[in-house]
């Protein structure tokens, strides 16, 4: 948990709004991480939230989404080829948040690089969540998951 004011925008021409990217390329990148076909989920999830894509040399190399939640803003999913890209996406995504609002990110423990990033960002653990899947969703590349899409019902 942190606040937007803790970070300045990171300028990078590879960071683009979702509407400047071919959706098929985004789906292709997403399929490198998880085997479940997520076209419908992605279309519905992304159309109602702010999404940035890291698009470099004609390839999607990461993307992230931020949305308002009950207690601030939630980032997720945050998928990237490496920690540097995840960091740039995260810092640019949170610029959409109200300056004093809390920022949340659900980080999977299966990616040690994501935990290092959270430490670098000085985020504090506020809760622990269990991840469950239906229909045997398989993660192919856990090293690319820096934040998961979560929907909290309380």
Give the predicted meaning of each segment.
Residues 2-20:
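Conserved N-terminal entry element of GNAT/NAT acetyltransferase domains
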Residues 16-154:
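Intrinsically disordered, low-complexity, positively biased terminal segments
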